[in-house]
Amino acid sequence: MEEIEELIYKYALQNAYKHGGKAQDKAVVSKIFVERPDLRSRAKEISEIAKKIVEKVNSMSIQDQERELKEKYPDLLEEKKKEEPEKKTLPPIKVEGKFVTRFAPNPDGPIHLGNARAAIISYKYAEMYKGEFILRFDDTDPKVKKPIKEAYDWIRKDLKWLGIKWDKEVKASERLEFYYSMAKELISKGFAYVDTCSEEEFKKMRDASKPCPNRLKSAEDNLYLFEKMLNGEFKEGEAVVRIKTDLSLPDPSQRDWVLLRIIDVKKNPHPITGDKYWIWPTYNFASALDDHDLGITHIFRGKEHEVNAEKQKWIYNYMGWKYPYVEEFGRLRLEGFMMSKSKIRTVLEKGVSIDDPRLPTLAGLRRRGILPETIIETIITVGLKVSDATISFDNLAALNRKKLDPIAKRLMFVQQPKEFIIELSEPIRAKIPYNPSKPSEYREILVNPGDKILLDAKDAEEGAVVRLMELCNVTISGNKLIFHSKTLEDAKKLNAKIIQWVKKDEASNVEVIIPDPNEEKPPISGYGEKEIGNLKINEIVQFIRFGFVRVDNKIDNKVTVIFSHE
C-alpha cells in the first residue's frame, strides 16, 4: 500500500504544481490508472486514498510543492517544461500586396469579450502581414444605437490595454459631407433615389415587388428632392434615400434598402456633432463608403454581417470598386455572463459601472485581474471558427492562472481569524519567497515568544499539530500554539497540515469582494500579512490556499481586493 500512496503523492504534487498549487483528485487517479491499469479493479479504494493525499498536498505552499518535486521527482519538473504548448497563432490568409484592416465599433457601450474578437483578430493579422490597422468609430445612429460620449475613451483605453496600436482613427460622424457627396453621385447616376412614401406604404410595395413612385423619376428630380432634405424641408420619417437593388430578391430586406435617413436631432442630439446634421447614413452605407475610401483590403467580422455584405456589394458594383477580402466568424460567449450589448447598456443606465467585475466587459475583466495576454490568447485559440463558441470562466481562469503563476506574489491571508499566543523557546525568523520561481526575492517575518498569531478558524482544530508555513510546527492547545518541531520533514512525518498564518501586530485589514454575475455575495473580511499593506493598486497576487486577487483600493490600513479565481 505504501508504494501506491507514494505513486499518488508523486502525481498529486505534479498536478498541483501545474495548476497553481491545487491538485484535482480525479486527474491524479486517471494518471495512476494509466501507469498502473491493474489498479482499476480497486477504483473506489484508490479514489478514497487519492482524495486524502490530494487534500494534504493542497495544504502545502506552492514553494513546498516545488521543493518536494525537485528533491524527490525532478523528472516531473522536466516533463512540465516539455508539455508547454506551442504559441498559438492565427491561420494564414490570402494577401495580395497591401494589407489594411480596421476595427469599427459603435461607441454605444463598452467592449466586451465577444466584440473584442474582431479588434484582436484584425490587429494581429495587421501585425502578421506588416499592414495598417485603422480604428473607425461607427457612430452614425444618434437615435436607436445612440453613441455615448464617454464610450470613445472607454474603447481607446481597452484597446491600449490589449496592446493594440492604431495607425489612424476615424469617426464616421465627422464624415457626413463625404457621405452626402457620394449619395449625390449615386442619385445622379440613377442608382439611388429619394423615397417620400411612408414606411407602411413602402413595405406594401416592397413585399409586392413593386417600385415606389419616386424610383421611376429622373435623376434630376431626385437630386432636387435630396437638396430639399439637406435644406431641412422634410421632417423625420418623411423622406429617405434608397439604393436601387432588385425588387424580386427573395430577401425583402435586400430590396431598395435605405442609404440615408432624417433624424430629429433636436430630440436626439449626437454626442459629437450635436444638432448640426439631421441626415444620417445607415450602417451599411457609411461602412461601404469608408471601407473603400480608407483603402481597407481585409475585413474580419461576425457572421451576422453576411446580409450586410450583400447589401454593400450593390454600392461596390455600381461604383466599379473591388470588395475587400472578408473573413467571418461566429459569436463568442462567456458562459454565465450577460453578453448582450443592449442589456449591458441597460445595466449601466441603472448606475452599474463599466468595470463592474461581474460584467464580461474588458474593463470588468481587467478589474477582476484577468490579464490582457489571457484575453488575446483566448481569442487567437478560438480563431476564425464560423460556428458560435462558448468559453467557460473556468477555462479563462485556468489560462490566466498559468500566466500569473510564475510572476504573482504568494502572500498569506486569513479569513475567519482566530487568535492564538505562540509559545517558543526563542525567536524564529521565517524566510518566505514571494514566488517559487524567484527564491532570491523574499520577505522575513520575525516571530517572538508570546506573539499573537492569527489562524483561519477552519485550520484551528484543537489538539492538532500543524505547520505554520515556512516557520515551525506547533500543537494547537486552547488559545496557544505550542512549539513542537522545526522542519518540514518533521511535519511530513506527522502528516501535519501546512497552513497560512498572520502575525497580529503587523496584520493588514483585508476585504475580499467576490464577484458573481448570478448572485450578490457579501464580501469576505479577514487579515493579511504586513506585505499586503504595501501592495499597489491594480497589483495581482495570490492569497495562499485562497486564490488570486487584484488590489482594488487602499484606505488607511484597509486593503480591498477583488477575487479573480482560484
Swiss-Prot record:
Domain of life of the native organism: Archaea
Which positions does the motif 'HIGH' region occupy?
105-115
Q: Where in the cell is it found?
A: Cytoplasm
- For this UniProt record, give its keywords in alphabetical order, as a comma-separated list: Aminoacyl-tRNA synthetase, ATP-binding, Cytoplasm, Ligase, Nucleotide-binding, Protein biosynthesis
Q: Which GO terms describe its molecular function?
A: ATP binding; glutamate-tRNA ligase activity
EC number(s) per entry: 6.1.1.17
Gene Ontology process terms (BP): amide biosynthetic process; glutamyl-tRNA aminoacylation
GO terms for cellular component: cytosol
Catalyses:
tRNA(Glu) + L-glutamate + ATP = L-glutamyl-tRNA(Glu) + AMP + diphosphate
In terms of Pfam families, this protein maps to: tRNA-synt_1c, tRNA-synt_1c_C, tRNA-synt_1c_C2
Name the PANTHER family for this protein: GLUTAMATE--TRNA LIGASE, GLUTAMINE-TRNA LIGASE
**HAMAP family, per the entry:** Glu_tRNA_synth_type2
Role this protein plays: Catalyzes the attachment of glutamate to tRNA(Glu) in a two-step reaction: glutamate is first activated by ATP to form Glu-AMP and then transferred to the acceptor end of tRNA(Glu).
Q: Into which family does the record put it?
A: Belongs to the class-I aminoacyl-tRNA synthetase family. Glutamate--tRNA ligase type 2 subfamily.
Q: What name has this protein been given in UniProt?
A: Glutamate--tRNA ligase
